[in-house]
Amino acid sequence: FDVIEFPAILEFEDEDGGLIEKPLWPEFFDLEALLRTKASMPVFQWNAQYQQKPTAEEASIVKREWWNEWEKETPPACEYIIMSLDAAAERHNRADFTALTTWGVFLNEETSAYNIILLNSIKQRIEFHELKELAMSEYADWEPDSFIVEKKSSGVALYQEMRRMGLPVSEYTPHRGSGDKLARLNAVSDIVASRLCWVPQTRWAEEVVEEIAGFPFMSNDDL
């Protein structure tokens, strides 16, 4: 059978690889109105109701309700900070984003157990010089104890350059095949299921939770 989708906001790419958003029915729903609606509801609800991209909760490896919400404005004092980079192959490849996430390990005083919190998430389509600037800026801001770069695509050049600069960056070389990310997520799913992971109440954190909940069925799996 054929699946016909009518997303409320259509996404196109310009000649420079930039993203262009246009409303499906501008005479009735202009882009500003749709973006206001998008900002007013959870990401999973927007994707399902307006973008025709629902995610099946029962099929999720990592479920949304397993995450704890960090309600305070500032994150806890972290004993160990980890940054992870998944670099896109090319900016004009519309399917790929560059994803940079920062995580912290902290002692939960209520449970006397070590927990993990998402400190920041950036997902963009960028060129290598922009990637280098972004990585160096985030590194300076967070001063991570560990910076893991997926050694593929533009991540290879970034890893080599940061090593030459004497920065403590580690490489991760993925195996070939689509099952590698699935195996990695399965390996850490119990940590989230044990309610040891926290996310702040921000839009970018919500997008991380939604993308993980939709894996491996979502079109993008960069985060």
Predicted regions and their residues:
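Gly/Thr-rich phosphate-binding beta-strand-loop-beta motif of the actin/hexokinase/Hsp70
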Residues: P75-F106
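ATPase catalytic-site recognition across NTP-hydrolyzing enzymes
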Residues: F12-A87
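Hydrophobic residues at beta-strand termini and immediately following loops
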Residues: I4-P7, L119, Y172
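Nucleic-acid-processing active sites and adjacent nucleic-acid-binding tracks
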Residues: T101-V149
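Hydrophobic, well-ordered secondary-structure elements that form the walls
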Residues: Y50, D86, L100, A135, ...
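Anionic group-transfer/hydrolysis microenvironments
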Residues: A88, I122, K152
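Signature of the SF2 helicase/ATPase Hel1-core->accessory helical subdomain module
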Residues: F1-E13
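C-terminal nuclease/phosphodiesterase catalytic domains that cleave nucleic-acid phosphodiester bonds
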Residues: F44-K53, R91-R94, T101, S153-L223
